[in-house]
């Protein structure tokens, strides 16, 4: 029997990109899923598609940036074994040219939003479980200032949480992908997206960007490997080696 057959897994931000692909893989592996999304209609469509894989999936509308709804979400859901958080934004601009509020918001959306999620999740996760957050890899401090701080803060946060939750044998890790072509960029001009992809392909040592499947498999790996704790797994093709 697959060891995920009896496991309840929550994915915050599971209607597109890495979250959706992770959901598909976990359903194939027999897990019971609760996924969230901000858009009710999109969430319903995705749940319908996922039920073609397995009926063991449910959806909850959630805007994680609103603390009252975040608190209510965790109060209402059943206890779970694993959680994946895709929460966090992105930004461009250096420390001198980006608006102060833009930098501050980028940090808030990465560190403090995920810290709130961690605190609520700690009360609902079963012993021997795992919390997985999303950081980022390969950005430059001079053109992604707030995002860099936020991503580094996630790595520090998971180390602290891993120790604090170790008495309950709960692991805490993060996945840090570099730029990947996902629906996150759907509102950007196609030519601009192509230029960004070309830039990263020419910069990454492997000569290309990652696929959604390659990144999402890291979340699955961290769920299934029960001896990885307090780590941030960089999925960047060696970009941070440069």
Positions of PLM-derived features:
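Short, flexible catalytic-loop segment of classical short-chain dehydrogenase/reductase
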Residues: 40, 140, 176-187
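Rossmann-fold cofactor-recognition segment
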Residues: 50-67
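Catalytic loop of short-chain dehydrogenase/reductase
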Residues: 106, 117, 130-167, 179-180
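Conserved Rossmann-fold SDR core element
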Residues: 155, 165-181, 228-235
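C-terminal substrate-recognition "lid" of short-chain dehydrogenase/reductases
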Residues: 208-235, 240
């Amino acid at each position: 029997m697959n060891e995920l057959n009896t496991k309840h897994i929550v994915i915050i931000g599971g209607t597109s990109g890495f979250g959706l692909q992770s959901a598909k893989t976990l359903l194939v592996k027999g897990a019971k899923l609760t996924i969230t999304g901000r858009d009710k209609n999109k969430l319903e469509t995705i749940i319908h598609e996922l039920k073609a894989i397995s009926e063991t999936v449910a959806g909850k509308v959630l805007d994680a940036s609103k603390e009252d709804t975040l608190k209510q979400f965790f109060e209402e859901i059943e206890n779970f074994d694993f959680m994946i958080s895709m929460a966090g934004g992105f930004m461009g601009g250096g420390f001198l040219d980006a608006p102060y509020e833009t930098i501050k918001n980028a940090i808030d959306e990465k560190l403090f939003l995920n810290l709130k999620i961690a605190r609520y999740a700690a009360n609902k996760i079963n012993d021997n479980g795992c919390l997985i957050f999303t950081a980022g890899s390969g950005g430059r401090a001079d053109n992604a200032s707030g995002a860099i701080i936020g991503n580094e803060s996630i790595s520090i946060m998971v180390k602290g949480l891993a120790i604090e939750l170790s008495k309950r044998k709960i692991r805490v890790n993060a996945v840090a992908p570099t730029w990947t072509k996902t629906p996150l960029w759907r509102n950007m001009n196609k030519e601009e997206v192509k230029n960004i992809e070309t830039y990263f392909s020419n910069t990454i040592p492997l000569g290309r960007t990652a696929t959604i499947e390659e990144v999402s498999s890291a979340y699955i790996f961290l769920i299934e490997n029960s001896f990885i704790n307090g780590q941030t797994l960089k999925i960047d093709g060696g970009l941070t080696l440069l």
